[in-house]
Amino acid sequence: MTVGVLDAFLVTWSRARAAFGDGAPQDGSAYDQSPALLELQAEVAGGGPGQHWRGPGSDAYGQANDKQTAVLGEAARLDAQLRAEVDKSAEVVAAGRRELDGVRQWMLDAASEVPRTAEGERMLYPVVSRGSGEIVEILERAVADMHSISTRIGGIGAEYHALSGDLELGTGDGGGQAQIPLPSADKPMNTRG
């Protein structure tokens, strides 16, 4: 094989390949708790006031229970979306690696066909130029794909944040905190059963 232009290409290729890291790309399974959230959603939905509890307390509890059920369902949906986006990012990495490996192999095959002379070196210039262009295209495509994924993950994060604002622990005046009734002069507590 010729030395020089091919070596320069391989250095460029190695740097591009390093951008995709080593090892198996992590999929999104670690971020997806949707099965557990959906199970919890079903349990919470089953804990509503039902037909045997009536009145204002029942209505308030039922509304809070419905809201909690909806929040759990939304959290499950967001978890599944996050997993899908992380899976997509892993595929971008895997595809980039495959494509770069293909370009490298194509380059090595082409280099093996030219004579090991100055003329052979000159014959490699357009081949190296094309291979380098393909490396640039692979990197640009991966960056664009990762940017799109990042934007969507940011949107999912914003939805998670908005979802946390939908949770309340109680309906008292304590900013959503449960209130414990205290006796006062105008409202003594009834201690007799």
Spans of features found by a protein language model:
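Intrinsically disordered, low-complexity extracellular "stalk/linker" tracts enriched in Gly/Pro/Ser/Thr
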Residues: 1-9, 155-193
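Short, solvent-exposed coil/turn linker segments
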Residues: 21, 27, 95, 184-191
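Intrinsic-disorder/low-complexity coil detector
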Residues: 24, 34-35, 48, 180-187
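Short, charge-rich amphipathic alpha-helices with coiled-coil/heptad character
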Residues: 1-24, 54-55, 68-83
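Amphipathic alpha-helical hairpins/coiled-coils and adjacent low-complexity
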Residues: 28, 32-47, 51, 58-172
